[in-house]
């Protein structure tokens, strides 16, 4: 098990050695709390866009299903006649310049895996830049938009926001509820009291403090041919290699097991860079990966490589609440 995997395991399952990291946690908390205090006091340069900005983020390290929910929000807003744009940090991307407009024909190394996935799926105008304020300004200069979604950026306080949504993995929760490096939190748990809504990925019902949403498998898609098959394409009991380079790979493997397949799990680091050699496994079996991984593997994919497309399905109560917010934010 890699060091990062051991650390994640300790954060969520507990380990006495984490007590040694608490002095560093104290330093980290002072930095992030000071940063937020300066924002609340109006210090520094804060950019407020001429259109509403909705931040979709988390306070934990690891995946929470953010990208599928953003895709749902894009389509939901479009159905209500809103022109939507997205900004993202573009983690791992190496574009020729910044800010950078992501196009569907770009590579994941140029655009970043998650931004490229969003553009390929939705065709939405999307700009990447670690400076999200600059990304928003560039996007608005290029496109007439009614609304901006910020993919993550909860801690990017230089960008003013009109709505903050925080996603939490319902199964893992907040781990030991401690900040980095003694726990998985980017900000103290008290920060959740100031956001507009919590969404629990994998919850089967709304909770007192937040809404439920599920990730529903929608199709198997062949990396090479683009062939689309229903999720029952493989028979029950089918053995296959399962590849996941996401924040919480086990959630993907559990999904495959829920489809009654027998996955041979191959977990990689989040935003991993792949090669054909790295994904050549024995015995020879069909390979199924996440859609986020697929955008990095099409160029060297074998004939029997597939990705599982998933769609976010939020609760009815969240849909109603979100519609109310859109009406409130509309001019």
From Swiss-Prot:
It comes from the Bacteria. Transfers the gamma-phosphate of ATP to the 4'-position of a tetraacyldisaccharide 1-phosphate intermediate (termed DS-1-P) to form tetraacyldisaccharide 1,4'-bis-phosphate (lipid IVA). It catalyses: a lipid A disaccharide + ATP = a lipid IVA + ADP + H(+). InterPro entries: LpxK (IPR003758), P-loop_NTPase (IPR027417). Keywords: ATP-binding, Kinase, Lipid A biosynthesis, Lipid biosynthesis, Lipid metabolism, Nucleotide-binding, Transferase. PANTHER family: TETRAACYLDISACCHARIDE 4'-KINASE, TETRAACYLDISACCHARIDE 4'-KINASE, MITOCHONDRIAL-RELATED. ATP binds at residues 60-67. GO terms for biological process: lipid A biosynthetic process; lipopolysaccharide core region biosynthetic process. The keyword Nucleus does not apply. GO terms for cellular component: plasma membrane. GO terms for molecular function: ATP binding; tetraacyldisaccharide 4'-kinase activity. NCBIfam families: lpxK. This is Tetraacyldisaccharide 4'-kinase. Belongs to the LpxK family. Its EC number is 2.7.1.130. Pathway: Glycolipid biosynthesis; lipid IV(A) biosynthesis; lipid IV(A) from (3R)-3-hydroxytetradecanoyl-[acyl-carrier-protein] and UDP-N-acetyl-alpha-D-glucosamine: step 6/6.
